[in-house]
Amino acid sequence: MKTLVLLSICALLSVCWSMGAVEPEVVVDTVADTTADAAPADPAAAAAPSSSSSESSESSESSESSESSESSESSESSESNSSSASDSNSSSDSSASDSNSSSDSSSSSSSSSSSSSSSSSSSESTESSESSESSSSSSSSSSSSSSSSSSSSSESSSSESNSADSSASDSPSSSSSSSSSSSSESASDEAAKVVVKRDLASVLLRRRRAAPGGDLTPLQLESLREVCELNIACDEMAETAGIVAAYVAYYGPVPF
């Protein structure tokens, strides 16, 4: 169904172009005509170009009016065809876009062929108008391309800013989690140190068989001092008397 509609639209457009319904508009450059009329110095030579320029202006005006009416009729017919095609194919967006692109390319080719055929018979004013039209179309295309590039650059910058914001929002959470974990680890280390100090004192006192009053022999004191110096947990209780006093104060007198 889509192919049939496309073929029918192409056939109608080709018939319209073959009949000469679509032709470019002719714009008369009055400034060029006045300069061309003022150039010759002889009155006879000036009269001949002026009459020819007036005839060319009249013919160009009549051709412009007829071509504008024909182009408006052809545009109305093409619009009606495109509207009927879009109504019949409301669900097929791709076919409509294909038909639009094909109609645009065919219209550009037909306009170029008709402009080439008319440029051979028209004057320099039509050529200047065609060049101005082509320059305006190129400027419009360049403006559209620049707008599209600016929109794409703005989208990329917004996406980059979003990613930067997300990374910035992620970094404080990671730093806070790392700080909380380090604080919990330090607290557990301190608790472990306290436990190690207490257990070490009790084990050493039991192994050395301290006296009931808590007094130790010089040999036992020396051995305890050496052990505490090697152990990192005995940083504040390097003295053996301090270890024994802490044990006695916490656990009471030594039971053995």
From Swiss-Prot:
<comment type="function">
    <text>The carboxylated form is one of the main organic components of the bone matrix, which constitutes 1-2% of the total bone protein. The carboxylated form binds strongly to apatite and calcium.</text>
</comment>
<dbReference type="InterPro" id="IPR035972">
    <property type="entry name" value="GLA-like_dom_SF"/>
</dbReference>
<dbReference type="GO" id="GO:0005179">
    <property type="term" value="F:hormone activity"/>
</dbReference>
<feature type="signal peptide">
    <location>
        <begin position="1"/>
        <end position="18"/>
    </location>
</feature>
<keyword id="KW-0372">Hormone</keyword>
<dbReference type="GO" id="GO:0032869">
    <property type="term" value="P:cellular response to insulin stimulus"/>
</dbReference>
<keyword id="KW-0091">Biomineralization</keyword>
<dbReference type="GO" id="GO:0005509">
    <property type="term" value="F:calcium ion binding"/>
</dbReference>
<feature type="binding site">
    <location>
        <position position="229"/>
    </location>
    <ligand>
        <name>Ca(2+) 1</name>
    </ligand>
</feature>
<feature type="binding site">
    <location>
        <position position="222"/>
    </location>
    <ligand>
        <name>Ca(2+) 3</name>
    </ligand>
</feature>
<feature type="region of interest" description="Disordered">
    <location>
        <begin position="38"/>
        <end position="193"/>
    </location>
</feature>
<keyword id="KW-1015">Disulfide bond</keyword>
<feature type="modified residue" description="4-carboxyglutamate">
    <location>
        <position position="222"/>
    </location>
</feature>
<feature type="modified residue" description="4-carboxyglutamate">
    <location>
        <position position="226"/>
    </location>
</feature>
<dbReference type="GO" id="GO:1903011">
    <property type="term" value="P:negative regulation of bone development"/>
</dbReference>
<feature type="binding site">
    <location>
        <position position="235"/>
    </location>
    <ligand>
        <name>Ca(2+) 1</name>
    </ligand>
</feature>
<feature type="modified residue" description="4-carboxyglutamate">
    <location>
        <position position="229"/>
    </location>
</feature>
<feature type="domain" description="Gla">
    <location>
        <begin position="218"/>
        <end position="252"/>
    </location>
</feature>
<dbReference type="GO" id="GO:0042593">
    <property type="term" value="P:glucose homeostasis"/>
</dbReference>
<dbReference type="GO" id="GO:0008147">
    <property type="term" value="F:structural constituent of bone"/>
</dbReference>
<feature type="disulfide bond">
    <location>
        <begin position="228"/>
        <end position="234"/>
    </location>
</feature>
<dbReference type="GO" id="GO:0060348">
    <property type="term" value="P:bone development"/>
</dbReference>
<dbReference type="InterPro" id="IPR000294">
    <property type="entry name" value="GLA_domain"/>
</dbReference>
<feature type="binding site">
    <location>
        <position position="229"/>
    </location>
    <ligand>
        <name>Ca(2+) 2</name>
    </ligand>
</feature>
<dbReference type="GO" id="GO:0031214">
    <property type="term" value="P:biomineral tissue development"/>
</dbReference>
<feature type="binding site">
    <location>
        <position position="226"/>
    </location>
    <ligand>
        <name>Ca(2+) 2</name>
    </ligand>
</feature>
<dbReference type="GO" id="GO:0032571">
    <property type="term" value="P:response to vitamin K"/>
</dbReference>
<feature type="compositionally biased region" description="Low complexity">
    <location>
        <begin position="38"/>
        <end position="186"/>
    </location>
</feature>
<keyword id="KW-0732">Signal</keyword>
<dbReference type="GO" id="GO:0005576">
    <property type="term" value="C:extracellular region"/>
</dbReference>
<dbReference type="InterPro" id="IPR039176">
    <property type="entry name" value="Osteocalcin"/>
</dbReference>
<dbReference type="GO" id="GO:1900076">
    <property type="term" value="P:regulation of cellular response to insulin stimulus"/>
</dbReference>
<feature type="modified residue" description="4-carboxyglutamate">
    <location>
        <position position="236"/>
    </location>
</feature>
<dbReference type="GO" id="GO:0046848">
    <property type="term" value="F:hydroxyapatite binding"/>
</dbReference>
<keyword id="KW-0301">Gamma-carboxyglutamic acid</keyword>
<keyword id="KW-0964">Secreted</keyword>
<comment type="similarity">
    <text>Belongs to the osteocalcin/matrix Gla protein family.</text>
</comment>
<protein>
    <recommendedName>
        <fullName>Osteocalcin 2</fullName>
    </recommendedName>
</protein>
<keyword id="KW-0479">Metal-binding</keyword>
<dbReference type="GO" id="GO:0044342">
    <property type="term" value="P:type B pancreatic cell proliferation"/>
</dbReference>
<feature type="propeptide">
    <location>
        <begin position="19"/>
        <end position="209"/>
    </location>
</feature>
<dbReference type="GO" id="GO:0001649">
    <property type="term" value="P:osteoblast differentiation"/>
</dbReference>
